[in-house]
Amino acid sequence: MHRTLLFLTWLISLTKAFNIKLPHTEKKDHLESNAVLACASYINTLKWSFDSSVVPGFYSTICSYSPAFDTWSLCIFNSLTDQIIPMDNTSFEESLGNVRKTCSFVDKKFSNISLEQYYSSLNNASSHALEDYGSIESLSTSIRVDRETRSRWIRAFHAHAYNLDISSVYGAYLTYYFVIVGIIAVFFHMSHYNGLNRALFASRFVNYIRGHFVLPTFLVDKHANHFKFLNVEVFTGLMPNSLEAWIIFGYTLANIIFLSISYIIDPYNLIFNSHLSQFTRLLADRSGILAFTQFPLIIIFTARNSFLEFLTGVKFNSFISFHKWIGRIMVLNATIHSLSYSLFAIINHAFKISNKQLYWKFGIASITVLCVLLVLSLGIVRKRHYEFFLYTHIILALLFFYCCWQHVKIFNGWKEWIVVSLLIWGLEKLFRIWNILQFRFPKATLINLNTSNNPHDEMFKVIIPKYNRRWHSKPGQYCFIYFLHPLVFWQCHPFTIIDEGEKCVLVIKPKSGLTRFIYNHILQSLNGKLQLRVAIEGPYGPSNLHLDKFDHLLLLSGGTGLPGPLDHAIKLSRNPDKPKSIDLIMAIKNPSFLNGYKSEILELKNSRSHVNVQVYLTQKTAVTKAANARDQLIHFDDIMTELTSFAHIGNARPNFSNVIENAIKSTPPGDSLAVVCCGPPVLVDDVRNTVSQKLLGYPERIIEYFEEYQCW
C-alpha cells in the first residue's frame, strides 16, 4: 500500500514539474459561435454578385466579397444584441475569433482579419444595408437580416451545438456513476474499521438485500464457473454475480437513457433537410461521444491496481467484469454511431463524398478493429489461448486508439479521452515495472514433488528468497510470477503465495503452456531440483480482509485453492484474542498435494487449541488405481500420519451446506462469522449460493462471505 502511494506521489510531482497539459474539448454551444455560423449559413444561401469560383470554398463569398462580409458582421451584431441586454460589444469582439476560424478554411490570410476591419464592416453595413432585398436577384450591397430569420437559424445551430456539449456531459455522468459505486463500496469496506458492519449485517432488511441481490450468482448457478450461452461452445463466458449484474444493469440503463433524451429538433430543417436527417446526425454524435467518454473506465478496470482494491475492497474479478461489460456497451455505442452516420450520409446523398474523407476512413478502420477485438475477446479464445488473446488485445487496443485519434483529429475535440486512457495505461505499466524491480530478481529453487511418477501427482514447489525484506504479502494475496528462462521470460501467471518472512512459497500443478514447460525443465535437472531466476509482480488482491475482527472463522478450500485459507489459518492462529475459533476445511482429490505444504500445515499442529483442521479425500480410489500404488501409499502415509494426530480425516466429499449450517449454529447470537472460500469454480459458486441462502434463513446473524478465487 505504501509503495503504491509513494509511486503515485512521484508521478504527480513529475506531471507538475513538466507542466503536462491535456487536450481539452471546448464548449461548443456559445452564443457567439452560434451567431457567426447561423448568419454565415443563411447569408451563404443568398445570391450575390460574386464569382465564387475565383476563391473556392463553402464560405468564400462571405469571406471574400465585401458586401457579403458587411452583411455578416451586421447580422452577428444584431443577433448578439437580441440576446444580450445591455450590449457592451464584448461579445461582438469575441465573435471575431469565430469569424477568423471560419474564414481560415477558405484561405489562411483571412485568419488575420483585424478588429478595426471588423468594426469598419459593421459600421458600413449599419449605414448602407438594405431592409427589403427580396426582389433583388443578385445582391451587390449589404443587407439587414430580419430578427425572425436570425432567431430561427441561431436556434438550429444551438440544437446541434447543444447536443455535442450535453453528450460530453452525459458521458462524464457515466463515469461518475462508477465513482458513486466506488464511494458506496468504500463506505461498506471502511465499516470493518469502526465496527459499523456488525450493526449493518445484523439487520434483517440488509441481509434480505444481501441474500437476494448481492451475494448469489445471477440467473444461473454459475459465476466462477464458465457458462455457455444457448449451450453453444463459442459463446463461453463468465456471468457476473448478482451485485455486479445490478451495477452493470444500472450502467446500461443510464447509457440507454442518455442516448434517448435531450434532443432539440429544429422544426424548420434549416441545417439538415429533414427531421430524420437531423435525428440521425444528432444520434450519431451522441453515441460516438458516449463511446469516447468510456475509454478511461475501460482501461482503469483492466489495471492491476492494488490501490483501488485497497480502498474499495472490490476484487480484481469484479473490475474485469466491469471492463468487459463497459467495453460491450462502448462497442454498441460505436456501432450506433457508425450506422447513424452512414444513414445520415445516404439521406443527404453524400455517401460517396464522405467515403473519400480521411476522418471517415479512420472511422471505418476504428469500428473494424473494434469488431475484430471483440471477436478475439470471446470467452472460448481467452480460455483456450490466453497468451494469444492477451497480446492481440493489447496490439488491437493501441491500433484502435490511433484510429480514433485520426478520426477526430479535424474536429477539435474529444482527444482528451484518448490521452487520459493512454496515460492510465502507460502509468500502470510503469507501476508494474517498478513493482517488479522492488522485489528484484532472486534465484528461486524449484523442486519436483512427484516422487511416485503418477501423472495425478505432478506438481512442483517454488521457494523464492526475499532480497527486499520490506516486501510483504498478506494471506490471500497473489503475485504474477515470471520465470526468467530465455524461451518464456515474457509470460506470467498469477499464483497465491505464502510469505514466510525470509522466503515466499508456492506449489504449482502444471497444466499446459508455461507451467508445463517449467515442470519438464525441472524433470530434466539433477535430483528434480532447479535453480531459476524469477521476477515477482505484486502482491495484488485484498490486503485488509479484517478477518482478525471476526469472532469465528470458517476457511473452505478445495483442490489447489489451499494456500490462501492455509495462510489465513497460520497467521490468525498467532493472535491470542480473535478469532475465537478457526475451522479449516480442506477438500482434495488425494493427499499428495498436501506434501507441498507439509511444513506449513504442520505449523497448525502446534498452534492454539481453537484451530480445527478437517481434511476430506474426495477420490479415495485414485491411489489404488495407480500402477505403483504401494509406493504412493507409503508416500501419502507420511503426511496422513502427521495429520491424524491433530486433524479430522474424511474419505468423502464434504457437504458444504451442512458445514456452513453447523458453523452458523455454533456461532453464538451477536458473534460474527466470516466464511472464506478458495477452490475450483464449482465449489466457490456452490458456497456463494449456500451462504446467500443461509443469510435468508438466519437474517439476524452477522455473516460475511469472502471469495478468494481469481479468474481473468
From Swiss-Prot:
Signal peptide (residue range): 1-17
Ranges in the Cytoplasmic compartment?
189-244, 309-328, 382-387, 438-712
Enzyme Commission code = 1.16.1.9
Location of this chain's protein in the cell: Vacuole membrane
**Binding-site positions, FAD:** H493, P494, F495, T496, I497, I498, D499
| Residue span, Ferric oxidoreductase domain | 287-411
The chain positions of domain FAD-binding FR-type read 412-546
- Give the residue spans that cross the bilayer: 168-188, 245-265, 288-308, 329-349, 361-381, 388-408, 417-437
Question: What are its GO cellular component terms?
Answer: fungal-type vacuole; fungal-type vacuole membrane; plasma membrane
* Reaction catalysis annotation: 2 a Fe(II)-siderophore + NADP(+) + H(+) = 2 a Fe(III)-siderophore + NADPH
InterPro entries given for it? FAD-bd_8, FAD-bd_FR_type, Fe3_Rdtase_TM_dom, Fe_red_NAD-bd_6, Ferric/Cupric_Reductase, FNR_nucleotide-bd
Spans within the Vacuolar topological domain: 18-167, 266-287, 350-360, 409-416
Record-level GO BP terms: copper ion import; intracellular iron ion homeostasis; iron ion transport
**Which cofactors are reported in the record for this sequence?**
FAD
Q: Which GO terms describe its molecular function?
A: ferric-chelate reductase (NADPH) activity; ferric-chelate reductase activity; metal ion binding
For binding NADP(+), which residues are annotated in this chain's numbering?
G538, P539, Y540, G541, C678, G679
Which sites does the entry annotate for glycosylation?
Answer: N89, N112, N124
Question: What keywords are annotated for this sequence in UniProt?
Answer: Electron transport, FAD, Flavoprotein, Glycoprotein, Heme, Ion transport, Iron, Iron transport, Membrane, Metal-binding, NADP, Oxidoreductase, Signal, Transmembrane, Transmembrane helix, Transport, Vacuole
Q: In this entry, which stretches build a coiled coil?
A: none
Amino acids binding heme 1: H323, H393
Chief place of localization: membrane
SUPFAM superfamilies in UniProt: Ferredoxin reductase-like, C-terminal NADP-linked domain
The highest taxon in the source lineage is Eukaryota
Relate the protein's function as given in its record: Metalloreductase responsible for reducing vacuolar iron and copper prior to transport into the cytosol. Catalyzes the reduction of Fe(3+) to Fe(2+) and Cu(2+) to Cu(+), respectively, which can then be transported by the respective vacuolar efflux systems to the cytosol.
The family this protein is said to belong to:
Belongs to the ferric reductase (FRE) family.
Q: What is this protein called?
A: Ferric reductase transmembrane component 6
Q: What is the lineage of its organism?
A: Eukaryota, Fungi, Dikarya, Ascomycota, Saccharomycotina
